[in-house]
C-alpha cells in the first residue's frame, strides 16, 4: 500500500512537496534533492507527516 508523505524543505522556507511511497520497499525516512522556488535553488527535502 502506498502512503502519502510530505517532503519538507531543509532550507527553512516552509515550502513542501507531497508524494507517495511504498513503506514495504522503503522503510526508512525518504530524502531527495529538489528545487525550492522560495530559496531559488536545489536543497534537500526530508520526509514528514501529512497533518
UniProtKB/Swiss-Prot annotation:
Residues 7-20 have a biased composition (Polar residues). InterPro entries: Ribosomal_bL33 (IPR001705), Ribosomal_bL33_CS (IPR018264), Ribosomal_bL33_sf (IPR038584), Ribosomal_zn-bd (IPR011332). Pfam families: Ribosomal_L33. Keywords: Ribonucleoprotein, Ribosomal protein. SUPFAM superfamilies: Zn-binding ribosomal proteins (SSF57829). GO terms for cellular component: cytosolic large ribosomal subunit. Residues 1-23 are annotated as: Disordered. GO terms for biological process: translation. GO terms for molecular function: structural constituent of ribosome. Belongs to the bacterial ribosomal protein bL33 family. This is Large ribosomal subunit protein bL33. It comes from Saccharophagus degradans (strain 2-40 / ATCC 43961 / DSM 17024).
Amino acid at each position: 500500500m502506498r502512503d502519502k508523505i510530505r517532503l519538507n524543505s531543509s532550507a527553512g522556507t516552509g515550502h513542501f512537496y507531497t508524494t507517495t511511497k511504498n513503506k514495504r520497499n522503503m522503510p526508512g525516512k525518504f530524502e531527495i534533492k529538489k528545487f525550492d522556488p522560495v530559496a531559488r535553488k536545489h536543497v534537500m527535502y526530508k520526509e514528514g507527516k501529512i497533518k
